[in-house]
Amino acid sequence: MRIIVVGAGKVGTALCRSLVEEKHDVILIEEKEEVLKRLSKRYDVMGFAGNGANFKILEQAEVSNCDVFIAMTDKDEVNMISAVLAKQMGAKETNCSRT
């Protein structure tokens, strides 16, 4: 499955690791470039630096082609907006969770 995760906190990072271990195609969107670079090197994930509620970032991550979109930043508004945008852009399943 093609899965997009927004947010690379403790839970987001653990989720990415588990999804990669299960052989999913994982795309990570994270605001902090240094965190994104570290995780992209450690795990087999494609990364996009930026705000998950930004339409252009979601377009770059090809949200319209994802099977599952999971927003799990520490900001409720980013989680809600990004999940709604992802659904409108064609994501098959969306989920938002506060970490």
Locate the predicted segments by residue.
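Cytosolic regulatory regions of ion transport systems
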Residues: 1-99
